[in-house]
Amino acid sequence: MAVKIRLARFGAKKRPFYRIVVADSRAPRDGRFIERIGQYDPMLSKDNKNCVVVKADRLKYWLNVGAQASERVLWFIKKGIITLEAEKKKVETKKAEIKKVKEQEV
């Protein structure tokens, strides 16, 4: 089973919207998929940060286990529109949160 990372078309006529999905290469373009990892809206301006939204950690996982990216997904990666670096989430500990509240009270 060859697995591909590709675009699946959704949206209305002349108003396309794409989902970035991981699917079996034999499945239809808009058919069954394994996992939805992002979306692409070509109707938004190119500098809009929501034009392409991808779960970077899942994309990296699927590429590491051997999934092949389609030409358009590879183009997004090469242009830097999709970054494979996972964004670090800010996690505040309970102690840091309590300390911050105490500082604001004083």
Swiss-Prot record:
This is Small ribosomal subunit protein bS16. GO terms for cellular component: cytoplasm; small ribosomal subunit. The keyword Ribosomal protein applies. It comes from Wolbachia sp. subsp. Brugia malayi (strain TRS). Belongs to the bacterial ribosomal protein bS16 family. PANTHER family: 30S RIBOSOMAL PROTEIN S16 (PTHR12919), SMALL RIBOSOMAL SUBUNIT PROTEIN BS16M (PTHR12919:SF20). Keywords: Ribonucleoprotein, Ribosomal protein. NCBIfam families: S16. GO terms for molecular function: structural constituent of ribosome. One of its GO terms (biological process) is translation. Disulfide bonds: none annotated. InterPro entries: Ribosomal_bS16, Ribosomal_bS16_CS, Ribosomal_bS16_dom_sf.
